Swiss-Prot record:
This is Rac-like GTP-binding protein 3. Keywords: Cytoplasm, GTP-binding, Lipoprotein, Membrane, Nucleotide-binding, Palmitate. A motif (Effector region) lies at residues 37-45. The keyword Metal-binding does not apply. Belongs to the small GTPase superfamily. Rho family. Transmembrane segments: none annotated. Inactive GDP-bound Rho GTPases reside in the cytosol, are found in a complex with Rho GDP-dissociation inhibitors (Rho GDIs), and are released from the GDI protein in order to translocate to membranes upon activation. It is a peripheral membrane protein. One of its GO terms (cellular component) is plasma membrane. GTP binds at residues 15-22, 62-66, 120-123. May be palmitoylated. SMART domains: RAB, RAS, RHO. Its main location: cytoplasm.
């Protein structure tokens, strides 16, 4: 058990400002929705977490999505094991910025790090009062979120609500799983590269043998 607990996973949340990243982190770590003061950035948090009988030390890093933090934000990416990339289900602009802004930024500063795509504020997507107060706003559908996951190559797509706590734990369970149990495609790629390496070695060996024979 001690050796399992020593496995450290750095999880960094990324996405536009005001999509609910900080609320999601507070909800996950305190099991309650913040109703008073909500900080711009959540303090770094670390705790032992058990997922699928495996204990890991999960470190959570929050980032500010506003342009004012564009220079400082990438400093948090160093050493990241997984990114939780969030957009609001009731903000199409934040959804579109996943491809426009966040994927290019992550590919530049942290290429190859797995991503869990998250649609936040799930409770508001079906809230009739909220929709009436925001005429013309078209929520992001589950199908559109799943399509975006495929486009960016994210390991998971999860919709959650910090206010109701729906699926919040599932977001970070998925982030842990993608590190300790990489998706099948990633494992297959590694095996394929290994097989290709072996076949190349065998090919070179064959050429050497034929040279010696002649």
């Amino acid at each position: 058990m001690a050796s399992s607990a020593s496995r450290f996973i750095k999880c960094v949340t990324v996405g536009d400002g005001a999509v609910g990243k900080t609320c999601m982190l507070i909800c996950y770590t305190s099991n309650k929705f913040p109703t008073d003061y909500i900080p711009t950035v959540f303090d770094n948090f670390s705790a032992n977490v058990v997922v699928d009988s495996t204990t890991v030390n999960l470190g959570l890093w929050d980032t500010a999505g506003q342009e004012d933090y564009n220079r400082l934000r990438p400093l948090s990416y160093r050493g990241a094991d997984v990114f939780v990339l969030a957009f609001s289900l009731v903000s199409r602009a934040s959804y579109e910025n996943i491809m426009k802004k966040w994927i290019p930024e992550l590919q530049h500063y942290a290429p190859g790090v797995p991503i869990v795509l998250v649609g936040t504020k799930l409770d508001l997507r079906e809230d009739k009062h909220y929709l009436l107060d925001h005429p013309g706003m078209i929520p992001v559908t589950t199908a559109q979120g799943e399509e975006l996951r495929k486009q960016i190559g994210a390991a998971y797509y999860i919709e959650c609500s910090s206010k109701t706590q729906q699926n919040v734990k599932g977001v970070f369970d998925a982030a842990i799983k993608v590190v300790i149990q990489p998706p099948t495609k990633q494992r297959e790629k590694k095996k394929k590269k290994s097989r290709q390496g072996c076949s190349m070695m065998n090919m070179f060996r064959g050429r050497k043998m034929s040279c010696f024979k002649s």
